[in-house]
Amino acid sequence: MARDEFTKRIKDALAKRVCYRCSNPNCRAITSGPHNVQDRFINVGVAAHISAASPGGPRFETGMTSKQRSSIENAIWLCQKCAKLVDTDIETYNKHTLV
């Protein structure tokens, strides 16, 4: 089974909705910054799945459709550190905590 990825449009909307800040209330790190090329920027944020994008992933729900797994309702914008933390400690960061 393939991963149910977010579209670029969803990723962009998710980042902009939180002003490119990590959505973890204990972090709130800025996830974008300037690039040495003036019309570019560096992004260190990720659109993370609340319920995993594929079987075997953290918080995977068999009852979800592919469309539901790849929707903005199943997404959270995080810095890379928090994304790793959320996917590693699934007891602390369960679906209800992330929503």
What role is predicted for each listed range?
Residues 22-27, 79:
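Short cysteine-rich clusters marking metal-coordination/redox-active sites
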Residues 15-23, 71-75:
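Short metal-coordination and nucleic-acid-contact micro-motifs, chiefly zinc-binding Cys/His arrays
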